[in-house]
Amino acid sequence: MPGYRNIVVLALIIALPLAGCAAIQRGEAKDREQLLAAAGFQAKLADTPEKLADLRTMPPRQLVSQSRDGNFVYSYADPDYCQCLYVGGPKEYSAYQRLAKEEEIRLYRP
């Protein structure tokens, strides 16, 4: 059974970094979503199969702007972790940019 043990060890060597990458992505999404909420973005849960299907058609974990009736609307879709859509306007987007810059400075301050 030495060959079987080698296969198991190899599978673990491959799987562990992938699990780590998923955890990092989940953590980054959580951090961004906390900033969006702090900036005043409204979280809308995809609490029906139809809403979740709509959410999955949007670019995942990207802040996207759209013009509606002459006003900008910003949205951030997370179909994987929170299964929700964050929505805000120019005021919330400006607050988000300020908070994100403050967080960047805090993290990279020597």
What is the meaning of each model-derived region?
Residues A22-Q25:
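Bacterial signal peptide processing site
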Residues L52-P110:
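Intrinsically disordered, glycine/charged-rich N-terminal periplasmic/extracytoplasmic linker segments
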Residues E33-A53:
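Compact soluble domain cores
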Residues P17-G20:
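C-terminal motif of bacterial Sec signal peptides marking the signal peptidase cleavage site
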Residues M1-V9:
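Bacterial N-terminal signal peptides that target proteins for export
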